[in-house]
Design a protein with these regions (language model features):
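PLP-dependent aminotransferase class I/II
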Residues: 1-167
């Protein structure tokens, strides 16, 4: 099963994919770059991105639902997703951020139970109202160890303005 998964879910023949899989093998150059990048990640980026995320959490927790990492743990913060009251509020804030030059992403427009790759699963097509609601209310905002404090201040200010938290 592991061998199959590491080659895109390959079955007994080359084009017979029997499960979800991936190809995560690195060539020598990719491995060399990654070795240097991992050192920078350990020495600087992990701590710094957690500081950026903690600042978002502190400044936004009273106006949107923010992600929580248990005490004593770190996250690599591939994304920082905030949860709004409803889809309309999310879309309004997203448009406002984009008008002000702030990129955003909706990484989860629909739940896994709604994605074709899982149509063979028992939950495919089922109504999962909590999952569906979260997908409609979630927005990823910029997070990076290199995000400047003044840029983060602007993002925070714009979100607070549009959610009415500054009133």
């Amino acid at each position: 099963v592991i061998r199959s998964m590491r080659v895109h879910g390959k079955g007994s023949s080359k084009y017979d994919n029997v499960r979800l899989g991936m190809n995560s093998r690195l060539d020598t150059i990719q491995a060399a770059v990654l070795q240097v990048k991992l050192q920078a990640f350990k020495e600087y980026e992990l701590e710094k991105v957690n500081e950026v995320a903690a600042r978002y959490t502190e400044k936004l927790a009273d106006c949107v639902k923010v992600p929580m990492v248990p005490e004593g743990y770190y996250s690599s913060w591939a994304s920082y997703n905030i949860l709004f009251q409803d889809e309309a509020q999310r879309d309004e804030v997203r448009a406002y951020l984009q008008e002000n030059g702030i990129p955003t992403m909706i990484y989860y427009p629909k739940g896994l139970h709604q994605q074709k790759v899982f149509e063979h699963c028992d939950l495919y097509g089922e109504e999962l109202p909590v999952t569906t609601s979260i997908c409609k209310r979630t927005l990823a905002i910029p997070v990076s160890p290199y995000l400047k404090e003044e840029d983060q201040d602007k993002i925070i200010r714009l979100i607070r303005e549009k959610t009415g938290a500054n009133a």
